[in-house]
């Protein structure tokens, strides 16, 4: 494929072939979202440590299977919320908690604002690019016709393969709150209020592009 032509690293069409290589100690999983959990579990079963991009899963159940596998196979697994490595977050935590510069924190709010254009809406299904092994690309996802204009990237806004903006950027900003404000002591929410929708565009996307979520954790 194009990647094999551009880079000198060995290329694989099927990740399972890579996982069989005993010389590989760890893998970074940067597939489409719908593959994250299964690929991570396969890697751990093969004895590899894992860095898996966010979002980890489509559901709590899927995510728990990855946690269970990490404990079963005693492997290191890191989720791709890379802003935790930013020294600024440590400074903000010190500002809030050690210095108590703002006093007692009672409430935390995260916002993500960014323009996102229409992905289009075709009258006929999108032809799959010839260079794509579509069965392998789909993996655990449903085989459904695609009506968006572009095959690549815009799978984010299809619940079958993506997780919408909440799974794309929401993961990052919510993890910032969990890390900085809660210091990872946040409990499972007692109540969740979620509202929003797909506004402005009548396109093929089925995930919200405007989304408000309130988590009542009772942690503060």
Where are these regions (language model features)?
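Rossmann-like dinucleotide-binding domain that binds NAD(P)(H)
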Residues: 135-220
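A contiguous active-site-proximal alpha/beta segment in oxidoreductase catalytic domains
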Residues: 49-51, 57-136
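Residues embedded in well-ordered beta-strands within globular domains across many folds
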Residues: 28, 106-109, 138, 193
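Short, solvent-exposed loop/turn elements at domain surfaces
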Residues: 2, 21, 116-119, 145-147, ...
């Amino acid at each position: 494929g194009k990647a094999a032509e551009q880079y000198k690293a060995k290329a694989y069409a099927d990740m399972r072939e890579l996982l069989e290589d005993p010389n590989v100690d760890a893998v970074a999983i940067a597939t489409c979202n719908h593959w994250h959990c299964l690929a991570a579990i396969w890697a751990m079963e093969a004895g590899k440590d894992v860095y898996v991009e966010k979002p980890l899963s489509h559901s709590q159940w899927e995510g728990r299977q990855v946690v269970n596998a990490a404990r079963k196979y005693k492997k290191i697994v890191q989720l791709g919320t890379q802003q935790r490595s930013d020294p600024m977050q440590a400074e903000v935590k010190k500002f809030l908690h050690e210095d108590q510069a703002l006093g007692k924190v009672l409430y935390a709010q995260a916002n993500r604002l960014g323009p996102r254009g229409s992905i289009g809406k075709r009258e006929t299904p999108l032809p799959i690019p010839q260079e794509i092994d579509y069965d392998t690309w789909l993996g655990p996802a449903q085989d459904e016709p695609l009506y968006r204009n572009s095959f690549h990237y815009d799978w984010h806004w299809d619940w079958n393969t993506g997780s919408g903006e909440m799974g794309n950027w929401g993961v990052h900003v919510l993890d910032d709150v969990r890390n900085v404000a809660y210091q990872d002591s946040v409990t499972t929410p007692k109540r969740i209020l979620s509202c929003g929708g797909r506004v402005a565009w009548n396109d093929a996307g089925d995930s919200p592009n405007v989304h408000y979520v309130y988590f009542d954790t009772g942690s503060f």
